[in-house]
Structure formats: structure tokens, C-alpha cells
Amino acid sequence: MSIVSELSVNTPVVLVLTTLPDSEAASALAQQVIDTRLAACVTEFGMVKSRYRWNGKVEAAEELQLLFKTSLARSDELTRFIEANHPYETPEIVSWQADASAAYGQWITAETQRPLNV
């Protein structure tokens, strides 16, 4: 099998993006998600500036952006968890399915498996 055909076997994963008001809130949410195995990895992009209309006014805020990498099987649960534990009244939660390399996708799937109760 050639290297090209080995690399073309992709695994579907789900990426979930959200923003938080500060590093304390971002770190807490990221740690909870990893601890509960709802995502295999959380990437913190750092501060971004968001402009949006809220209650009839244009607002601007500096926020921390997080990108969660999870499996198809855990994506809905992750979205519900973020929504329930987010400090904003209407949090930005955007998700999309993506193809990952086979090894990375398998790692995400393995790391987001529910632990077996023994």
C-alpha cells in the first residue's frame, strides 16, 4: 500500500468552537471537558475581539476562543455540557464535522470513550 493511500483513510471527528470571557472560565471549562472525556483535546487560541449586536446595541468584547476536538459519538453531549456550564446567557457554540488523519481520529475516538464501570 502506498503512503498516499494510507493517508487517505480519514476518520470523522467533530470540532466545537466557543468563546469565554476570561482565562479562568476557559481553563475551568476545558479541564471539566477533558476530565469527563467529552473531548480528547481543547485548543486555546487566546484572546480574540468579538463584535456583535446584543439587546439592540452593537457591543465589542475581548474573549478567549476554545476549540474542542471530539468524536461523533460524544459531540451532542459535549454541546449540551458547554451550554449548561457556560457563563454566558447565550454562548457561542458552533460545531462542524471534519475529517482527521486516521491515527488522530482514532486517538480522539479512544480518548472520548466512556469509562467502563468496574
Which residue stretches match the model-derived regions?
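Positively charged, small/polar-rich N-terminal and surface patches that mediate targeting and assembly
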Residues: 1-118
